[in-house]
Every structure is written in structure tokens, then in C-alpha cells.
């Protein structure tokens, strides 16, 4: 069992789980794993949270002591960093400092290979082994210690790429953006404006402490209020590192990742561009989307929660579209990771091309009611037997009714997540999920 890497890199509460000492040891372990890194380049970027500088300094110390040069791109989205790592010459790795949608108390470290993909599980496990060993790894002589370069200018390369994909303009459209005080606070409004849209941007003045704070993709109902006051034709709300997006139709309907997947799948299929007539979702993907896809002769492949697992299935089957309910959408013809900005631009491109409103594209996708709860398990070792008991409790409460359930330990937070879904009133699902939560809490109180 891995101690540090979860489903999305290393993540935890800053100065408790994720310390500068750990960040330094990680970069030294990477030096140890890759061996001769003298003169190699690593791109480092971050979201806007205040702990970024502390963690970046620690990482830089480890890399430069091994002779690596650091290209500091500053505040950037995770997908933009992934793209730049792949498209910048002589780069060995990319490192993103971010805890994505989590509150400011958290931060994380994600590592990308120079092909733009996150590290494989087995490589992460090997790096953990190096991290746990005594640091006897290469240290450069004083004349060969690495240096830091300000490379914030290469973000323009990513912006240019997005404009090439859209290959048009959005003149006549008014767009609302909730940037969650995160990585897209500057670049998202810039790109939409450069493409001719009128932009109303909220939550862009970050201060290091307000990322994801009652805003962004984690709080769509709050964003919806901003949208309804904006007078915009369409709205998009992002998370802290810009790898997910939730949209709003012209009447304020929340368009989540499942509905966006349905819209994108139909568009690509109509164009003859949907590879394999299949898309990838997760165990959380709504049954309503699956029914819709069947009606347009598209197969849904389900996998574990996490965009890395969605990507694994895309690669396995040679597909080009996948995503999660939360708004991680992978348009694999263009990007190797979820990209909130690309997804929002692509949706607006479809609207303009078809000359319709977003509600018209979404109306045939009936999303079944779904409710979520979570139970804190911080400090507890959740065994397989305990997880089985959680499922038994859930089945006892559901009592044979036609309701789909998911009970799983989170890969990014110390919580157990409970999801119920069915073609029944949401109020009824809420009653059931709260009963399940209460029984699981009672069970955990004995440990």
C-alpha cells in the first residue's frame, strides 16, 4: 500500500500531511529515481493558494541540488501545465502544485511525464521507495547546481493552441465565468475576450486564501446565482486548478459533466469523429446519461472515479472522449487530461455552429436524481471488512428498492463517500442517504 501517492498525486493538509520537508524529499527522490538529471529541465506551476511558494521552494531546492534547471511558469491550470510539458523542448518532467477543488488548507503535488501524462502507478510506487530511503542521491558540484528561470511567458503557447482548436470567434455571445479565485482567474476571461465574447467574470481577484471558497465548480448553486444576475447567454464555473467545469444554460439550468458528455458525444458522433462509438465515464456517471447514449447508439464504459482512470480506459480502447460527473472532461484529440477551459470553449463552439441555446442541446438527457453524503474517517484505518460492512448497511437501508448506490473511500480526502441514485423523488433519496450516514457514523464510533 502506498503511503504518499493517492489517486491524484500527493495531497493533504499543509504543514500536517504535506510539509516542505516532504516536498524536498520528493524532489530528491525524483532525482534518485531518474539518475543522471544534470542539466535536465522541470516545469513547475501552481494554483493560487498561499502555500504554493513554500512547497515550490522546497521542490526547487531538491531539483536544483541535483543539477536540474527549473522553468517556473507561475500560476497556471493543471491542463495548461500538462500541455506545456509535452510541447516544450528538453523537459523531463512537469510538477503542478495544487489541491484542485479542495479548500485552501489542502495542497498537493502532481507529476507529469514529458508526454503530458501523469506518472504511472508503478513509477509513483518506485519514487515512494526512493523517498523512504536515505538520501544518497546525486548532488551537483557547485558549478553545476541548477538554476530557476521565469518562464511565465510560455503560457501564451497554450492560449494560442486553444484559439487554433476553436478556429472561429464568439462575437455576439455574452459569457459568465466563475473562476473560483483559482488558476483560470486571468487566462479564461482573456481567451474568451480574445475570441470576441463579452465576458462577465467573477471571483478572479485571488489573495492566496480564497480559492474555491463558496464559489466555483464545487458550489454550482452559488455560481448559478451569479449567472442569473449576469445577463449572460451561457455560464461556466471552474475549480481551483482549472481541470473541471460546470456550465449553465441560458435559463440557469446546471449542466454537469454527465450532460456535457452527452452533448459532446452526440456532436462528435454526428461529425463522424467519435472513435469506437464509445465514451468513458465512471461508477458515478448518471444512469440517465447511459440511457441517452443507448438511444444514440453510443456505448458507455464505466471505470473507477478519477480522471486518470478515465484516461486509462480511453487509451485502452483507443477512444477520444471521457469524463466525470464533476466536470472533468477529456477531449483526447486535443488534451491528455481534463481541461475546464477547453471544454467550455468547445461547448460554446458547438452552440454557435448549431445556432441553438444550451438548453436545447441538453433537453433530451434526463438525469436521474442523485444525492451525496460523506463521512469523515480522518485518523482511522478503513479495512476491507469495514468497507464491506458499509455496503451491508447501505443494502439494509435500501431494502431491495431499485436504487443504485456507491459507497467508497475517497482517494483525495479522508472521507467515505455515499451516493444514491434512482428514478425516484430526490427527497426520498435524501432520507435514505442520511440514514446510511448515521449508521456508518455509529459503526465508526466503535473504532
UniProtKB/Swiss-Prot annotation:
Residues given in the record as Mg(2+) binding sites: 100, 239, 241, 243
Enzyme Commission number: 5.4.2.10
Active site positions: 100 (phosphoserine intermediate)
Phosphoserine modifications at: 100
CDD domains: GlmM
Enzyme class: isomerase
PTM (free text): Activated by phosphorylation.
Keyword entries, A-Z: Isomerase, Magnesium, Metal-binding, Phosphoprotein
Entry note: cofactor: Binds 1 Mg(2+) ion per subunit.
Reported cofactor(s): Mg(2+)
InterPro entries (UniProt xref): A-D-PHexomutase_a/b/a-I, A-D-PHexomutase_a/b/a-I/II/III, A-D-PHexomutase_a/b/a-II, A-D-PHexomutase_a/b/a-III, A-D-PHexomutase_C, A-D-PHexomutase_C_sf, A-D-PHexomutase_CS, Alpha-D-phosphohexomutase_SF
GO terms, molecular function: magnesium ion binding; phosphoglucosamine mutase activity; phosphomannomutase activity
GO process terms (BP): carbohydrate metabolic process; peptidoglycan biosynthetic process; UDP-N-acetylglucosamine biosynthetic process
Domain of life: Bacteria
Catalytic activity annotation: alpha-D-glucosamine 1-phosphate = D-glucosamine 6-phosphate
Function per UniProt: Catalyzes the conversion of glucosamine-6-phosphate to glucosamine-1-phosphate.
NCBIfam families: glmM
Family affiliation: Belongs to the phosphohexose mutase family.
The protein's name: Phosphoglucosamine mutase
Organism: Dictyoglomus turgidum (strain DSM 6724 / Z-1310)
Taxonomy of the source species: Bacteria, Pseudomonadati, Dictyoglomota, Dictyoglomia, Dictyoglomales
Amino acid at each position: 500500500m502506498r503511503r504518499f501517492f493517492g489517486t491524484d498525486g500527493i495531497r493533504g493538509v499543509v504543514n500536517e500531511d504535506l510539509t516542505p520537508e516532504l516536498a524536498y524529499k520528493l524532489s530528491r527522490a525524483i532525482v534518485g529515481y531518474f539518475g543522471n538529471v544534470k542539466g535536465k529541465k522541470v516545469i513547475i506551476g501552481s494554483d493560487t493558494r498561499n502555500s504554493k511558494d513554500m512547497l515550490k521552494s522546497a521542490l526547487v531546492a531538491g531539483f536544483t541540488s541535483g543539477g536540474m534547471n527549473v522553468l517556473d511558469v507561475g500560476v497556471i491550470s493543471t491542463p495548461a501545465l500538462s500541455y506545456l510539458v509535452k510541447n516544450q523542448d528538453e523537459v523531463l518532467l512537469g510538477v503542478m502544485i495544487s489541491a484542485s477543488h479542495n479548500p485552501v488548507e489542502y495542497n498537493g503535488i502532481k507529476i507529469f511525464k514529458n508526454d503530458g501524462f501523469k506518472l504511472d502507478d508503478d513509477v509513483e510506487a518506485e519514487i515512494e521507495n526512493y523517498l523512504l530511503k536515505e538520501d544518497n542521491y546525486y548532488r551537483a558540484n557547485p558549478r553545476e547546481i541548477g538554476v530557476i528561470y521565469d518562464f511565465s511567458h510560455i503560457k501564451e503557447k497554450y492560449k494560442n493552441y486553444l484559439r487554433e482548436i476553436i478556429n472561429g470567434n464568439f462575437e455576439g455571445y455574452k459569457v459568465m465565468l466563475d473562476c473560483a479565485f483559482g488558476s483560470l482567474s486571468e487566462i479564461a476571461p482573456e481567451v474568451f475576450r480574445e475570441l470576441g465574447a463579452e465576458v462577465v467574470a467573477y471571483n478572479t481577484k485571488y489573495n492566496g486564501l480564497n480559492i474555491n471558497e463558496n464559489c466555483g465548480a464545487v458550489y454550482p448553486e452559488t455560481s448559478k446565482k451569479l449567472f442569473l444576475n449576469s445577463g449572460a447567454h451561457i455560464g461556466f464555473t471552474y475549480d481551483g486548478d482549472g481541470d473541471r467545469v460546470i456550465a449553465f444554460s441560458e435559463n440557469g439550468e446546471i449542466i454537469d459533466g454527465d450532460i456535457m458528455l452527452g452533448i459532446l458525444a452526440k456532436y462528435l458522433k454526428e461529425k463522424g469523429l467519435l472513435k469506437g462509438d464509445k465514451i468513458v465515464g465512471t461508477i458515478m456517471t448518471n444512469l440517465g446519461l447511459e440511457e441517452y447514449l443507448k438511444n444514440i447508439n453510443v456505448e458507455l464504459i464505466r471505470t473507477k472515479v478519477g480522471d486518470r482512470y478515465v484516461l486509462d480506459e480511453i487509451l485502452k480502447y483507443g477512444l477520444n472522449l471521457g469524463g466525470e460527473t464533476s466536470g472533468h472532461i477529456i477531449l483526447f484529440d486535443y488534451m491528455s487530461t481534463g481541461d475546464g477551459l477547453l471544454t467550455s470553449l468547445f461547448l460554446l463552439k458547438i452552440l454557435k455552429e448549431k445556432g441553438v441555446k444550451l438548453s436545447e442541446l441538453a433537453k433530451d438527457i434526463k438525469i436521474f436524481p442523485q444525492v451525496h453524503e460523506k463521512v469523515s474517517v480522518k485518523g482511522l484505518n478503513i479495512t476491507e471488512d469495514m468497507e464491506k460492512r458499509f455496503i451491508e448497511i447501505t443494502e439494509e437501508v435500501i431494502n431491495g428498492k431499485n436504487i443504485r448506490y456507491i459507497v467508497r473511500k475517497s482517494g483525495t480526502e479522508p472521507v467515505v463517500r455515499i451516493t444514491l441514485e434512482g428514478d425516484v423523488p430526490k427527497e426520498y433519496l435524501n432520507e435514505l442517504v442520511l440514514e446510511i450516514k448515521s449508521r456508518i457514523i455509529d459503526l465508526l464510533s466503535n473504532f
